[in-house]
A protein has these predicted regions:
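Glycine-/small-residue-enriched transmembrane alpha-helix faces in small-molecule transporters
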Residues: 1-42, 47, 90-91, 95, ...
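C-terminal-most transmembrane helix of multi-pass membrane proteins
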Residues: 2, 44, 56-60, 230-232, ...
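Hydrophobic alpha-helical transmembrane segments of multi-pass integral membrane proteins
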Residues: 7-12, 38-58, 84, 88, ...
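Helix-helix packing/entry segments at the starts of transmembrane helices
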Residues: 17, 40-42, 114-120, 187-209, ...
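Specific transmembrane alpha-helical segments of multi-pass solute transporters/efflux pumps
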Residues: 23, 58-117, 153, 238-256
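Hydrophobic/aromatic residues within transmembrane alpha-helices
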Residues: 30, 39, 43, 103, ...
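C-terminal transmembrane-helix exit sites in multi-pass transporters
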Residues: 50, 54-55, 121-145, 270-290
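Hydrophobic transmembrane alpha-helices of multi-pass small-molecule transport proteins
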Residues: 51, 136-158, 212, 266, ...
Length: 310
């Protein structure tokens, strides 16, 4: 039975990684029709709506039902920490995704490259642990160093005069996105311990829809024609990348060892590279492929715990 659960967890986490990886290509396609703020607002609004039925299903098995048939109305019994946590996580998520999408909108940053740079958040998280008095181990520092080398090979262009030390603007935006995603992971870690994960995510998505909506009003002029032209990638991002993949991650991690799940989920970078090659016909130089391999290796090694006994 245990083996069956482990297999289920592996399949679900791998499904989440595939969906998230292909989401980079979906974002690139959608950004050809709508602005980053418009895309993020539409995506998060739909994602929040998609999670409401999921909440109803899960709450029907508990005494914290969102809908009360007896009262005939919605019971707003979400605890204060869920509202605060969802709002904080939502603001961070909206900033991270807008930075990512602005980077993808540039010519020099493609979906495959963005996928690997974004995955660096796994390595960056331990650095923020310094602010909480948690000093990273030597293994983590080595992984951080390897990640920097991989990022250099992946993102810094090679000219006739040799290697350049100038990072492309789009790649820099995606790197900033990885930093904000690191803060997002820490925020989830802080708030998720005493909150319902799906409710927290739902509030997060609705908050994440408000922030870019305000940006959209002042900086973009979205049209119904543009939104309709991008409706398929928007629905993919909202329903599959947010609703389905998030649920797969939650259930999958319940059946998979805590040291294995992050490694499987980090494979989204590989599927992001594959998706960019298949759907967007993206290509990489040999050095960039080496950079991808180094980044992936650094991410995987950072999640391994040699002291953990099974």
């Amino acid at each position: 039975m245990k083996q069956k659960n482990s297999l289920l967890g592996m399949i679900l986490c791998l499904t989440a990684a595939v969906v998230w990886g292909l989401a980079f290509s979906a974002q690139a396609v959608a950004l050809e029709q709508v602005g980053a703020a418009t895309l993020n607002a539409a995506r998060c609004l739909i994602a929040g709506l998609v999670l409401i039925p999921v909440i109803l299903i899960f709450d029907s098995k508990t005494d914290r039902r969102l809908f009360s048939a007896k009262e005939g109305k919605l019971r707003l019994d979400v605890r204060k920490k869920e509202w605060i946590g969802g709002a904080v996580c939502g603001v961070l998520l909206s900033i991270a995704t807008i930075l990512q999408q602005l980077g993808l909108a540039t010519e020099e940053t493609d979906a495959g490259k963005a996928a690997f740079i974004t995955t660096l958040y796994v390595v960056i998280v331990p650095l923020f642990g310094l602010l909480r008095g948690k000093f990273p181990s030597l293994r983590i520092w080595l992984c951080i160093g390897a990640a920097v080398v991989g990022l250099y090979l992946l993102a810094v262009p090679v000219t006739d005069g040799g290697f350049s030390f100038r990072m492309a603007y789009g790649d820099l935006l995606v790197l900033l996105c990885a930093v904000v995603f690191s803060l997002h992971v820490i925020a989830i870690d802080v708030f998720s311990a005493e909150t319902d994960g799906i409710r927290l995510s739902c509030i997060q998505f609705f908050t994440s829809a408000v922030v870019p909506s305000l940006v959209m009003i002042f900086t973009e002029t979205p049209t119904l024609a543009g939104i309709w032209a991008a409706i398929l990638p928007i629905l993919y991002l909202a329903v599959f990348s947010s609703g389905v993949a998030y649920t797969c991650q939650i259930v999958g991690q319940q059946h998979l060892d805590v040291s294995i799940a992050p490694i499987v989920l980090s494979l989204e970078s590989v599927f992001g590279l594959i998706g960019g090659a298949i759907f967007l016909h993206e290509t990489k130089t040999p050095l960039q492929y080496v950079g991808c391999a180094v980044v992936l290796l650094a991410v995987i090694l950072s999640q391994l715990n040699p002291r953990k006994k099974r």
